[in-house]
């Protein structure tokens, strides 16, 4: 009885060695070890490593995960309809170590007002660069709204400023001529 249980569970080594399946009506070669009777031929039953029943997540419109799912990544809060309440998170971090929270909020499609007045200038600059890089990767927007105060928004938020508003436009600083530009001009003139 224990042997039959092992056979059913597939714990015994296979003793049947057979060739590829042939169309019906052609002979098949079947060899077995001595003392072992071959099983009667039966049509193969399909075996699947996955469940073919529809999952509950398909009914809700979300993307299924697992080996049968496509490479599409669901957007958090993508099911929001127009006119839904958008969340704005106001943060006043004291160190750079709090910046991953800002990135997480942006990934959750929340706008973030970042007040960096409590940070050291070097850490504040590093923080702005870090969050600006993450904002760029999600096609978001950034806007300076005050001294050491910045607005970072995901791509689903449109930011507009008033023309002639409170914030003066930045004046471009003249850049020194590049050494590369001088070399290129000298080679063309020769």
From Swiss-Prot:
Subunit and partners: Homodimer. Interacts with FtsZ.
Organism: Thermosynechococcus vestitus (strain NIES-2133 / IAM M-273 / BP-1)
Family per similarity comment: Belongs to the SepF family.
One of the record's GO cellular component terms: cytoplasm
Gene that produces this protein: sepF
UniProt keyword terms in alphabetical order: Cell cycle, Cell division, Cytoplasm, Septation
UniProt-annotated stretches for the region Disordered: 15-71, 164-190
Protein name: Cell division protein SepF
Pfam families, per the entry: SepF
Compartments, record wording: Cytoplasm
General function of this protein: Cell division protein that is part of the divisome complex and is recruited early to the Z-ring. Probably stimulates Z-ring formation, perhaps through the cross-linking of FtsZ protofilaments. Its function overlaps with FtsA.
One of the GO BP terms on file: division septum assembly
Broad class of where this protein is predominantly found: cytoplasm
Compositional bias segments (type: Polar residues): 54-71
